[in-house]
């Protein structure tokens, strides 16, 4: 059994309420069933599964060869708001006995139905861990309130899209308990191949129907605006009658307003109309084939904006029920849908088209990820949830440990030459610092980092410093969410696709944050330096290379692929010198320490570097500092090179001002003081007048990389953790 602290099988209770959530839960249930060494599965069926009017869909669960442990009749008929509330109450009355009998370790709940809210409430109050499937999504209806309420009750979260993951993080959920897996139903969608799909089409729509020459309609009531929902459904049916294509109409969900929608169908004779087939339920594997080969789908079901995109089938999304969801280009929104002509026009626009397949909601590998996630759950961990609230300015909870100890962070700086580890206090004081040469191989480097951090952590105890976590600054591109170095600079070898968080966290039993050196410098300025209290500013680091970080509205910008603030690679000349990145004309190719060293060597080789009062020992490499010294002593060529370098940096700053319009630019690093006056001159000459009042200053921080690494940890301690 995988390492998770458990010495027995995990008892998993899957509770399903209707046909839609079963389509998402079934792939997970099949996956659990295939691993009996790890899991025991109990299935609880309730809600509309057990209602004859909605097809008694519990039978399809039995046909899938699942043993239904418990059937709970929880639906109070009436299909109005009061009936929904009474149904939740009835479920809350019945569920405690079931859960006491089953004693599950974890309950899996899907989506945003009122039945699911009852399940999550019961499990939470009975101290049963909850895994919520498809949290974090936004539709634009009352479903959002229910979904987000379940999120607050749930201990673990499986989401389908990156934006849903970000919503969960914004809701202060613990990132370590969020899995971006994709939609489980996509595992079946993307592997569904049925050469005999025509027999399915004929079975549901008639023998004379051709592929791509029919419509699937699926519309549900919006419970916060039932009257408008009924009117829109009536207009939709009128438009479909007028469009005169064979149409499969599925009955709506058993929500408030559904009874009135069924009355509209019967009033218009839909169940007996030659062009319509009205059905209560279609098995999911057959439904997949029907929507995959339809001329279009119309309605307001989430299926239209989620699953159908996998086939590129045209979709007409009516009203506001799915207004907040991500959609592919196959979806045409008719948000008002207040006239028959408008809906009819949408049908003419969409019917029969074929769009590119969309995989916004999954890649077909959700279930393996979910099973791995389940196996990682440690039942010995405290049940109480932790919420990660945003920083609270200067508002740290006090206890006796806080008073007697110095709250501190371990900061790690991985440079091209040196590896440094420091104990940094809450006030930004470097209490103790360790420096070693950075090894050339991955194994030696990881080993040395661990050794130095363990040594520093032990020393922190002697110094009465309470270490709250580890922050790491490294060159290259970093995924800070995962703590992984994606691509490193050429100065640090064997440092691509490196997981830094896991080995340090496992060894030190502390939380670990990782970011690149440019971002760390910006965070150091935000917490300890001249950026403190500034809403928008940019930091430029002038060292061996050129880096930077951008703070916008007090937050660090990482970019969609963690490549924001590569300021050294802003191009300032079309025919400039080659850059280490493979391009040419970059700021770094002019103004970095490497660039100045290159120019210094050229002058030295031509005997044009040294002037009176200068000497370079034979065993000493010529570098940027020699060029600066020569310029100070009157070397005109050295002065010209520095002027060109400073101008290139200044042009880069002008581009930043025109793009970001920050109120402050901080120049950091050993070359900053040599460039600042030139940069200010370029701004006066080249920048728009509206941005020329920007403050450009030299950083007064001695170790921005270490302080920035520490700030990731120390900022975290100002959050409330419950």
From Swiss-Prot:
EC number(s) recorded for this UniProt protein: 3.2.1.183, 2.7.1.60
Post-translation changes: Phosphorylated. Phosphorylation by PKC activates the UDP-N-acetylglucosamine 2-epimerase activity.
Regulation: The UDP-N-acetylglucosamine 2-epimerase activity, in contrast to the N-acetylmannosamine kinase activity, exhibits allosteric regulation by cytidine monophosphate-N-acetylneuraminic acid (CMP-Neu5Ac), the end product of neuraminic acid biosynthesis. Moreover, the activity is contingent upon the oligomeric state of the enzyme. The monomeric form is inactive, while the dimeric form selectively catalyzes the phosphorylation of N-acetylmannosamine. The hexameric form, on the other hand, demonstrates full proficiency in both enzyme activities.
Record note on disruption phenotype: Knockout of the gene is embryonic lethal.
Residues that bind an N-acyl-D-mannosamine 6-phosphate: 416, 476-477, 489, 516-517, 545, 569, 588
Protein name in the entry: Bifunctional UDP-N-acetylglucosamine 2-epimerase/N-acetylmannosamine kinase
Region (N-acetylmannosamine kinase): 406-722
Subunit structure, as described in the record: Homodimer. Homotetramer. Homohexamer. The hexameric form exhibits both enzyme activities, whereas the dimeric form only catalyzes the phosphorylation of N-acyl-D-mannosamine.
Functional pathway: Amino-sugar metabolism; N-acetylneuraminate biosynthesis
Entries under Pfam families matching the protein: Epimerase_2, ROK
Distribution of this protein across tissues and organs: Widely expressed. Highest expression in liver. Also found at high levels in lung, brain and kidney.
Family: In the N-terminal section; belongs to the UDP-N-acetylglucosamine 2-epimerase family.
Catalytic reaction list: UDP-N-acetyl-alpha-D-glucosamine + H2O = aldehydo-N-acetyl-D-mannosamine + UDP + H(+); an N-acyl-D-mannosamine + ATP = an N-acyl-D-mannosamine 6-phosphate + ADP + H(+)
Binding site for CMP-N-acetyl-beta-neuraminate: 259, 271, 280-281
SUPFAM superfamilies: Actin-like ATPase domain, UDP-Glycosyltransferase/glycogen phosphorylase
Effect of residue 704 to R: Homozygous embryos exhibit cerebrospinal hemorrhages and defective angiogenesis in the diencephalon at 11 dpc, and become non-viable between 11.5 and 12.5 dpc. Loss-of-function mutant resulting in impaired sialic acid biosynthesis
GO BP: CMP-N-acetylneuraminate biosynthetic process; glycosylation; N-acetylglucosamine biosynthetic process; N-acetylneuraminate biosynthetic process; N-acetylneuraminate metabolic process; UDP-N-acetylglucosamine metabolic process
Keyword flag Chaperone: no
Role summary: Bifunctional enzyme that possesses both UDP-N-acetylglucosamine 2-epimerase and N-acetylmannosamine kinase activities, and serves as the initiator of the biosynthetic pathway leading to the production of N-acetylneuraminic acid (NeuAc), a critical precursor in the synthesis of sialic acids. By catalyzing this pivotal and rate-limiting step in sialic acid biosynthesis, this enzyme assumes a pivotal role in governing the regulation of cell surface sialylation, playing a role in embryonic angiogenesis.
């Amino acid at each position: 059994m995988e390492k998770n602290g458990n010495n027995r099988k995990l008892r998993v209770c899957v509770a399903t309420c209707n046909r839609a959530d079963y389509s998402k839960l079934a792939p997970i249930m099949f996956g659990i069933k295939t691993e009996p060494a790890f899991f025991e599965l109990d299935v609880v069926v309730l809600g509309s599964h057990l209602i004859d009017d909605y097809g008694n869909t519990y039978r399809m669960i039995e046909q899938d060869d699942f043993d239904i442990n418990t059937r709970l009749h929880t639906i109070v008929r009436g299909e109005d708001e009061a009936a929904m509330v009474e149904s939740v109450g009835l479920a809350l009355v019945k569920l405690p006995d079931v859960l006491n009998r089953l004693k599950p370790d974890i309950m899996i709940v899907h989506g945003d139905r009122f039945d699911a809210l009852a399940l999550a409430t019961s499990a939470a109050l009975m101290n049963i861990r909850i895994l919520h499937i498809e949290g974090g999504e936004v539709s634009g209806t009352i479903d959002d309130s229910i979904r987000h309420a379940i999120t607050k009750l749930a201990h673990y979260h499986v989401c389908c899209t990156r934006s849903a993951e970000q919503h969960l993080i914004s809701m202060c959920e613990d990132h370590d308990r969020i899995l971006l897996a994709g939609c489980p139903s996509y595992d079946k969608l993307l592997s569904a191949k049925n050469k005999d799909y025509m027999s399915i089409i004929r079975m549901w729509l008639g023998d004379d129907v051709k592929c791509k020459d029919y419509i699937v309609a699926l519309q549900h009531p919006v419970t916060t605006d039932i009257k408008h929902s009924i009117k829109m459904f009536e207009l939709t049916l009128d438009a479909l009658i007028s469009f005169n294509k064979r149409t499969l109409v599925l009955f709506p969900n058993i929500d408030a307003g559904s009874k009135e929608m069924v009355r509209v169908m019967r009033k218009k004779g839909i169940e007996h109309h030659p062009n319509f087939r009205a059905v209560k339920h279609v098995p999911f594997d057959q439904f997949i084939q029907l929507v995959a080969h339809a001329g279009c789908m119309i309605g307001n079901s989430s299926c239209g904006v989620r699953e159908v995109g996998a086939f590129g089938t045209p979709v007409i999304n009516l009203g506001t029920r799915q207004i907040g969801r991500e959609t592919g280009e196959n979806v045409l929104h008719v948000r008002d849908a207040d006239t028959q002509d408008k809906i009819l026009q949408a049908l003419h626009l969409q019917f029969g088209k074929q769009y590119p397949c969309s995989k916004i909601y999954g890649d077909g590998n959700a279930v393996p990820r979910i099973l791995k996630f389940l196996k990682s759950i440690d039942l010995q961990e405290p049940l109480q949830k932790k919420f990660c609230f945003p920083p609270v300015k200067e508002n740290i909870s006090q206890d006796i440990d806080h008073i007697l100890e110095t709250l501190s962070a371990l900061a790690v700086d991985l440079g091209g030459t040196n590896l440094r580890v420091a104990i940094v206090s809450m006030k930004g004081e470097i209490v103790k610092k360790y420096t070693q040469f950075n090894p050339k191989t991955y194994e030696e480097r990881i080993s040395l980092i661990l050794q130095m951090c363990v040594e520093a952590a032990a020393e922190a105890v002697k110094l009465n410093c309470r270490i709250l976590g580890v922050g790491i600054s490294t060159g290259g591109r970093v995924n800070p969410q995962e703590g992984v170095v994606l691509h490193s600079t050429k100065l640090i070898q064997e440092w691509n696709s490196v997981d830094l968080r896991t080995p340090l966290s496992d060894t030190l039993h502390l939380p670990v944050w990782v970011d690149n050196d440019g971002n760390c410098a910006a965070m150091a300025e935000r917490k300890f330096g001249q950026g403190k209290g500034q809403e928008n500013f940019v930091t430029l680091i002038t060292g061996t290379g050129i880096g930077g970080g951008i703070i916008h509205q007090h937050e660090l910008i990482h970019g969609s692929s963690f490549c924001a603030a590569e300021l050294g690679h802003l191009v300032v000349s079309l025919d400039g010198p080659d850059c280490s990145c493979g391009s040419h004309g970059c700021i770094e190719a002019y103004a970095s320490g490497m660039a100045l060293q290159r120019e210094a060597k050229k002058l030295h080789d031509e005997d044009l570097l040294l002037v009176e009062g200068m000497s370079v020992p034979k065993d000493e490499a010529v570098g940027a500092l020699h060029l600066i010294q020569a310029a100070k002593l009157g070397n005109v060529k050295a002065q010209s090179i520095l002027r060109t370098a400073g101008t290139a940096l200044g042009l880069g700053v002008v581009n930043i001002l025109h793009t970001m319009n920050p109120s402050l630019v901080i120049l950091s690093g050993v070359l900053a003081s040599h460039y600042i006056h030139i940069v200010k001159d370029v701004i006066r000459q080249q920048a728009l007048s509206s941005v020329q009042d920007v403050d450009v200053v030299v950083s007064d921080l001695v170790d921005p990389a270490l302080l920035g690494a520490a700030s990731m940890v120390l900022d975290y301690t100002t959050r409330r953790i419950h």
